[in-house]
A protein has these predicted regions:
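HhH-family (HhH-GPD) DNA N-glycosylase catalytic core used in base-excision repair
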Residues: 1-270
């Protein structure tokens, strides 16, 4: 049965900036301008009508509670933007340009595998691969006469081999995903401990031990799944922009940019 929740007079919520900024891969724009996505065991459509955000979906629980957690609706983004805007004009202008973006609270397992797949990849291809994995091994959920598929748990991927992943288009990432599944099933990667770890440095060290996880992927996982807002993922574009704006166009190494972000933005760097 379809549920609905309406967020009235919504501030700091612009679907296009949330779903098309590269933090998530299971959301797609619909013909009416809304977005439909699947996360965990929920399929939800998000539509903006004037100042209201309408959430409609086939959910595993109460849609309001699910949306509050996933979209971090209890966080005061107006206050956060106000604090960040005072740091410098570059950041102030960026906040105005990207107004309405929110950091989602995504599933750790799906986020981990998704960003391992993201290595040397582009967003359309990442989305295609994740959709193939989900359709092949996930559970089907129907919503508005269309079939959606959950991202498979480690247990669902237990018997999936390297060749199976390769046939889904993972390329060189197939062995990394295969090994990560195995390590998780053997509890060498403890997802529960990762979720409970409070120290960002300890968490980063543990994530870097996972096959296919480098510094950027580790920071993406911390920021987009574990609410570590001080995490600052550095890709080639972030590196270029920070180098140009703050270092007189002298290209800096990722570690230097990480240090700069920590000093400049503190625990809101992400």
């Amino acid at each position: 049965m379809e549920q609905q929740y309406i967020l009235e007079n919504a501030k700091s919520f612009k679907p296009v900036h949330i779903f098309e900024c590269g933090q998530c891969f299971r959301w797609n724009k619909q013909e009416d301008g809304s977005y439909t996505g699947i996360f965990k065991n929920n399929v939800i459509n998000v539509k903006q009508e004037n100042q209201n955000i309408i959430f409609s979906g086939n959910c595993s629980g109460n849609i309001k509670e699910i949306c509050i957690e996933y979209f971090d609706l209890n966080a005061n983004y107006e206050e956060i933007k106000g604090r960040l805007s005072k740091i410098d004009n570059y950041l102030k202008n960026s906040i105005e340009y990207g107004n309405g973006i929110r950091i989602l609270k995504q599933d750790l397992w799906e986020t981990l595998i998704s960003f391992i797949i993201s290595a040397n990849n582009n967003i359309p291809r990442i989305k295609t691969i994740i959709e193939r994995i989900s359709k092949a091994y996930g559970d089907k959920i129907e919503f508005r006469r269309k079939d959606y598929y959950t991202f498979p748990t480690p247990e669902k991927l237990k018997k999936v081999g390297i060749d199976d992943f390769r046939n889904l288009g993972l390329g060189f990432r197939d062995i990394r995903v295969y090994e990560t599944v195995g390590k998780t099933l053997r509890n060498e990667i403890d997802l529960n401990k990762l979720e409970k770890e409070e120290s960002v440095e300890t968490l980063r060290e543990k994530l870097l031990e996972i096959p296919g996880v480098g510094p950027k992927v580790a920071d993406c996982v911390m920021l987009f799944a574990l609410k570590k807002y001080e995490a600052f993922p550095v890709d080639v574009w972030v590196r270029r922009v920070i180098s140009e704006l703050y270092f007189d166009n002298q290209e800096q190494k990722p570690k230097k940019i990480q240090e700069f972000a920590k000093k400049q933005y503190g625990n809101l760097a992400g």
